[in-house]
Amino acid sequence: MRDVRPEYWMGLDVAVFLFFATSDVDRHLTVFDHSQSFFTSDRGRVLTLSWGHAGQSSIHCVSISGF
């Protein structure tokens, strides 16, 4: 496994907050794609969640540490 760069960890707390806030507010959104990727580093494992909104081509990615 490749090492995770320090920059990768910046903003994780904000990303986690936005992820859960979006999950609570936008429950009507349909998930059409979902993937999980695990990376290891000196600070532990990172769970990366990728999903997209139905009818849109954009894919959103959120990284959560401590899993």
From Swiss-Prot:
What is the top-level taxon of the source organism? Viruses
The identity of this protein, by name, is Uncharacterized 7.6 kDa protein
**Organism, as annotated:** Vaccinia virus (strain Copenhagen)
